[in-house]
Each structure stands twice: as C-alpha cells, then as structure tokens.
Amino acid sequence: LSGQSSERNLGALREEMDAVTLEMVRLLSRRSGLARRIGEAKRGIGAPVDDAARQASLRSKVAAACAGEGEAAMASRLLNFLINESVQVQSDAAPAAATSHTAIFQEAKRLEEEGHDIVHMEVGEPDSAPPEHAAAALAAACAAGHTKYGTAPGIAELRDAAAEIESVHGTPLTRENVIVTMGARFAIYLAIESLLSPGDELVVIEPAWPAYAQCAMRAGVKVTRVRTTLESKWEPDISEIESAITPNTKMIAINYPNNPTGKVLPARRQREIIDVAARRSLYVLSDEIYAPYSLVEWHSALESGHDRTIVTQSLSKSHAMTGFRVGYAVAPPREAQRMARLQSLCLTCVPTPVQHAALAALRAEPPGAARETLERLRGLAPMAAEAGLEFDGPDGAMYVFGRLPRGLDGGEVALECLRRGLAIAPGAGFGGYGPFVRLSACREAPVLARGMDILNSVLSGGGP
C-alpha cells in the first residue's frame, strides 16, 4: 500500500510540474508579445533596444521577490535569458539597419557590380597580397595530398609554431594551449559558446567590434556594456568595470589595439582590468589581432600570467590572408579542448591545405602589411582632423574613429558618402556612437585622399 501511495504521490507531483511548465510556456509567449509591442513603442520614439537602466530596475525587483526563497541564483540566470530574448525579439522585429558597417559593405559591393567606382574605407582589410610563400605552401599541400580530414585542434606543426610565437609574452606554451580556428571571429565564438552557459554574463568595453556581443547573445549570454568616451581618451573606468560584474559574470572581453578607436591601453590600466578578472575568477578574452599594428608600446594579456586568459589571433590582419580564413586561439589546455570539441561539431576542422599555408606564413619573416598600413594611418589622421573630425590618437590598429562636426549623424553621413562613391563605417554599430564614423586606412594614399575629398564635400554640404 505504501508503494502504491508513493506512486500516486509521484504522479500527482508530476502533473503539478506539468501544469506549472505549461503555464510558464503560456507566460513566455505573452512576454514575447509584450516585448514586440515594447520594441514598436521604442522605435516610435527613437529609443534604443538595449536599456541598461530598465534591466537593472527589473533585476532589483527579481532579487527582492527571491528574498528568502533560496532560488536567487537560478532566478538571476533565468532573468538574463529573458532579457536576451526580449532584446532579440525587439531587434529581429526592427527593420534591418541600413547603416551598419556590414550593410554599407554589402551595398558598396552591389554598387560595384553595377559598375560604380567605390572607395572602400569601411572595412579593415589590408590591400596587399598574401605572402607568396603562403600561396606556394597551399598549392604544395594540395600536391602532396594534404587534403584529408584533420583533427579539430589543428595540425601539430602549426600549433607548435603558434605556441612558440605567443610564448614570447612570458607564459610558456605548448601545442596543447593552441587551437587553430577559422579566423579570430570563430575563435571568439568558440570561446564564448563553449566556456559560458545561457544566463551567464559577458562584460564588453565599448566602442567594440560588434561580434563579441553578437556571439554572446546567440549563446544566450547576457552582455553588460562598459561605455568609454572620447573625452576619457577611450580608457575604461575600473570602478565601472567592477560595478558591471555580478555573480553571473564569467568573462571580460578586451581588444587592444582597439577596433574601432585604435586605442592601446597603458600597461597599468590593462593590468588593472585583468587583476579585477583574476580576483573574481573570470575569463579574460583578449582579441589581439591588431598586435602588429601598434604605434606605441603594446602588451599582450598573456603577460599577466592570469590562468583564465584566452587570446585570439588571425592571419587576416598580420599576413593579409583575409580570404584564407585562418587564425588561432591560445587558452589553458582544458579550455582549448572544450573549444576544439565545439569546432569539431561545427565544421570538423580548418581545411588542412589552409593550415599548411598558415604554417609557412608563421615560419617566415612577417610581411610589410602592418608597416605599410600604419604609414597610411599616419597620413589619414591629419586629413581626418582637417575635415573637422574629433578623435584621439590613434595608437594603432588601422582606423580613425572620429566624432563628426555639428552633431551630424554617422549613419546619414555614411549613406550620403556611399551615394557619392565612398564607403565608411557608421559609429552606431560599435556601441551606440551615433555621431561617429570609422575610417579605414587600408588603401593607397591617393585613394584615401580621394575618399577624404568625398567626405569633405559631404560635410561641407557641397553637391556631388
């Protein structure tokens, strides 16, 4: 009888759980509908989709509701998931942004296909050819039969070469610390997706390349933004970073030299950020693809010795191998293994012939792409200042990130420039910096001068 009673009790509990679950599903559907309506209202008044103050207020209400219930941690993670879903619903319902830098690039390519001449200053793509020895190694690998499936972490020789290069920063590394990836973008995705869970939080310092936040949101990870300003010379306030960290925070993303500002943090400030992460046992995801493009002293995050550091690198920038789609990540062995398992699921491995091309590139002397681009950047900066843009530095990378005069909107200026044959990147795509534009220095000096003539004409109100 006691067994039958227990079985009936179990059945009743399951029925109650089913009822609660179905009610949650109904409430989620209702909540998504409200999110869409809120998104429409925001668009009507020009309000941003992401509202940090509103999210903080809701978080406080949830914490108060959980007091004494013992479920605060789970409720907080669930709230992060719900916030992400609301942001995604509102973003998906919004008309596609016509002025993101990717949208500008795609439209510029379409115009070129129609026969229009476009000056490309919207993308950070070196215009030099890949190293000849890399192209030769690609062909040789195919001829030698290196065309089969490879292992997810990458070929051993390439991982050894990357480990040797990155060991100069003071942390001894082996191939077990390296995973070869489809460019740095995919390395960033692998790090976020494999090391964080839905409901976790990632701190991003803005202005920032949008892929950090995009990868996080696709993984169900809540993005907390720490905003920097031109007036502060793009240096983050350590107290603001500390305030942004919650019990759900698992990672801080940094990128120096920075895209889009070209900022290189002083060693002391970068160390302070990493120390904050170390005290909280957080991962530091350091995107260091612009390391060769520095006009001032630069330090890798690996120099800190923090044992939860992940560094991403790409041969796109260092060796002008953008179309090869190859890079790598440096991480503790356990984390590298987790990233490799996810890469195996997503794409098996980086194409083996491409890895042999990358190996040849890393073994040779670095090409002159960085040196050439930095010279162009030095020439672009005074032209941007003469056009009336306000900016700091830049200390490196390949961009000028400038505030437009007279409060002009970067998106509107970018569209008008494109109509006249110049593609530039609006600042809004890098974290809500609407009055800014990003100018890339990856073209020959005469081409950059022609592009700046177009920008000057637009800013002065002149005709086509």
Labelled PLM ranges:
Residues 1-95:
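Domain-level signature for soluble enzymes in the chorismate/prephenate branch of the shikimate pathway
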Residues 38, 62, 82, 104, ...:
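Aromatic/hydrophobic pocket-lining residues that form π-stacking "cages" and hydrophobic walls in ligand
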Residues 39, 60-67, 163, 340-343, ...:
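Amphipathic alpha-helical segments within well-ordered protein domains
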Residues 64, 92-109, 114-136:
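N-terminal basic, amphipathic alpha-helical segments
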Residues 111-114, 125-126, 132-133, 138-141, ...:
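PLP-dependent class I/II
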Residues 119-127, 140-158:
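A glycine-/small-polar-enriched, mobile loop at the entrance of the PLP active site in fold-type I
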Residues 149-181:
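Conserved N-terminal alpha-helix of the aminotransferase class I/II PLP-enzyme fold
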